[in-house]
Amino acid sequence: MSTLEVTATGAAADAVTTHVPTLVQDRVASRIFAKDHTLWGPAAEDESAKRLNWTGLPRTSRHLIGEVAALREELSQAGYDRVVLCGMGGSSLAPEVICATAGVPIDVLDSSDPDVVRAALTDLDRTVVVVSSKSGSTVETDSQRRAFEQAFRDAGLDPTARMVIVTDPGSPLDNDARAAGFRVVNADPQVGGRYSALTAFGLVPSALAGADVETLLDDAEAVSDLLAADDDANPALRLAAAMAGTQPLRDKLVLVDDGTENVGFGAWAEQLIAESTGKDGTGILPVVAIGAAPASLYDDGTVVRLVATDSESDSDGEQDTSDAGGSASSAASLVTVAGPLGAQIMLWETATAVAGRLLGISPFDQPDVESAKAAARELLDAGIGAGVEPAFTDGSVEVTALGGDWLGDATTVDAAVDTLLGLLDDQQGYIAVMAYLDRLGDADLELVARDLFDRTGRPATFGWGPRFLHSTGQYHKGGPATGVYLQVTT
């Protein structure tokens, strides 16, 4: 394989044949990299005009390499060898996959659970904390920042010497942190959060943890011209067509780790795709598969195999699907993607932007996330926190039903789950499991998604709260109204 390759078969290949020539004719790729904000229609122009700087990040972010290397050396000399990242959504997902792929440790704190936060407040004498928030007002991140500041002070340690702030210039966090004497690194404000992997949000915590961010940028820059080319072979155009151009639309995109060296890549791609496309009643639902993709998903979804860069594909661009899991039919929609992490970040960002054009939506806003944040602030300001009374209690488990009187006669957890699953549309439906628990201590709970695949034959996603609110939450609220939702809290 070349440095970056996308191959397709079945319905995905048909979509490539149908849509790529038009995308080439319309010069979509080159216009994206020229920052043409008119590509997504008049209603999207204002937002798009201030969200396209991600296209040049492989070059414009290079100044961070030396700056962060010097900071890491300074912190290392002071004895700080543990990096904790406080952030949500795009501020945490990219550093997590960058560090996991590089094999360097970083503790990502993207939970508001008091026990999880408390457990992170350890080894303070050797800890540097990176606080990342684009808006500078993310509630979860602000609470984590305050917890660490207080913990450092209680231990007799200076927080300003041990905390690094990453935020947009002029944000509330930027202003407050500078006034208090903290180190501040500003990110490019004309890059959206989910497109920020190659900005300070992705690079600063990753480099402080020891990841080689120069190679990451090198790999991204090496494919930029390829992705900007108005050419049938452009892998981003091919991937976008496979994602958003099947007829009828296969709106479930199943991401299967099939040997890729990019560890945890699916979680980063999940946010990018769901938050970019899930709006106006349409969108692509990314499903991060646990193991091989269930056979039923070949019937109505597109399965993407994330493979190692040394994998082999047929010379005509079609892929070997014999080990993709399940049993592919002749009508299957299958894609194989390979390439180093930096290259794939640019690939998927470009493809998602193109997919937005094919779907007729803006890939750069998140209207339902913003409205949900506003509603939450109103509730907090009003002092409302008691929630809804449970429908019944089964042992120590309280069961609450939202969205109508659908529980019927159910009086047990098992019966309630059965009733919920009975609401699934057997053609278009999906299940979203959301758990406000410890994603490290309760990691095995993710396997429930695979169990629900097997039980219902329908796609099932799993998200840890509250981080899913900054990821798939936009799709849940703004995408097709075909989901049923199972939320687990303590």
Residue ranges: model-predicted function:
Residues S2-V83:
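Low-complexity, highly charged intrinsically disordered N-terminal segments
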Residues N53-A70, P95-R146, V288-P294:
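Glycine-rich oxoanion-binding loops at beta->alpha junctions
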Residues R82-C86, V128, V164, V254, ...:
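Conserved beta-strand elements of the Class I
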Residues R82-I106, F462, F468-H470, V484-L486:
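Glycine-rich, small/polar surface segments that engage phosphate groups of diverse ligands
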Residues L109-D110, S132-S133, V185-V191, V335:
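Short beta->alpha connector loops at strand-helix junctions that form conserved
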Residues D154-V304, G317-Q319, D323, A338, ...:
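Active-site phosphate/pyrophosphate-binding segments
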Residues R305-A332:
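Phosphate/diphosphate-binding loops
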Residues A432-R467, T472, K477, T482:
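Extended C-terminal subregions enriched in glycine
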